[in-house]
Each structure stands twice: as structure tokens, then as C-alpha cells.
From Swiss-Prot:
PANTHER family: BIFUNCTIONAL INHIBITOR_PLANT LIPID TRANSFER PROTEIN_SEED STORAGE HELICAL DOMAIN-CONTAINING PROTEIN, TRYPSIN/FACTOR XIIA INHIBITOR-RELATED
Keywords linked to the UniProt accession: Alpha-amylase inhibitor, Disulfide bond, Secreted
Species, as recorded: Sorghum bicolor
Keyword Cell wall biogenesis/degradation: no
GO molecular function (one): serine-type endopeptidase inhibitor activity
Pfam families named in the record: Tryp_alpha_amyl (PF00234)
Family stated for the protein in its record: Belongs to the protease inhibitor I6 (cereal trypsin/alpha-amylase inhibitor) family.
InterPro entries found in the cross-reference section: Allergen/soft/tryp_amyl_inhib, Allergen/tryp_amyl_inhib_CS, Bifun_inhib/LTP/seed_sf, Bifunc_inhib/LTP/seed_store
Disulfide bonds listed in the record: 7-60, 21-49, 30-82, 50-101
Protein name: Alpha-amylase inhibitor 4
Length: 118
């Protein structure tokens, strides 16, 4: 049987995981503008990202952010001056904090690279 509460895409995490958050995180990390997204993403984009993240069970949010950034269908791209790792660190370590979406995750703190899938 399949555990539908498992922290995996298509189960407790939507598939594809958090597409708006991925779009939001790139310019927040890179500030690239142009074809890569706005230098300062709109508040609407942030609200959509936070709604997507809020819909994921709190215990699965770190995993969802990890799956989002390491997507199989469309992995992150390196940009000049903004590596995939920089984007990943921003998303995993900052999107759940008060300054962004202000959402609880695991007991004892926010997300860290060590508790997200790779």
C-alpha cells in the first residue's frame, strides 16, 4: 500500500512541487531581471508561493522545498553569478522564515540543507 501522508511529490507534496515558489525564489536569490524574472518579484507572486507552501503539511515543507529546487523535470539552471546551489540555499533556508512566508516547519526551527532531499 502507498502511504499518502509520505513527504513525496504526488502524495503529501503536490506534483510538480511549489511551481510559483520556484519562480519566486530565482529572482529573490539572483536579482537577474530580464528573461530570468523580475529583479524584485511582485507581492502577488510571493502570496501565491506562500499559499502553495502553506498547503503542504508543516512536517513536509522542508522536503517540498528540496524537491522544488532539485526538480527532475526541470532542474535548476546556473546563471552567471547565481549558481544552482545559491538558489537552493535561499529557498530551503529562507522561504519559511518570518520575512518571507512565516510558516512553521519541523519542531525546533526552519529548513536546512541537511533535512531536505537531494
Amino acid at each position: 500500500t502507498v502511504d499518502v501522508t509520505a513527504c513525496a511529490p504526488g502524495l503529501a507534496i503536490p506534483a510538480p512541487p511549489l511551481p510559483t515558489c520556484r519562480t519566486f525564489a530565482r529572482p529573490r536569490t539572483c536579482g537577474l531581471g530580464g528573461p530570468y524574472g523580475p529583479v524584485d518579484p511582485s507581492p502577488v507572486l510571493k502570496q501565491r508561493c506562500c499559499r502553495e507552501l502553506a498547503a503542504v503539511p508543516s512536517r513536509c515543507r522542508c522536503a517540498a522545498l528540496g524537491f522544488m529546487m532539485d526538480g527532475v523535470d526541470a532542474p535548476l539552471q546556473d546563471f552567471r553569478g547565481c549558481t544552482r546551489e545559491m538558489q537552493r540555499i535561499y529557498a530551503v533556508s529562507r522561504l519559511t522564515r518570518a520575512a518571507e512566508c512565516n510558516l512553521p516547519t519541523i519542531p525546533g526551527g526552519g529548513c536546512h540543507l541537511s533535512n531536505s532531499p537531494r
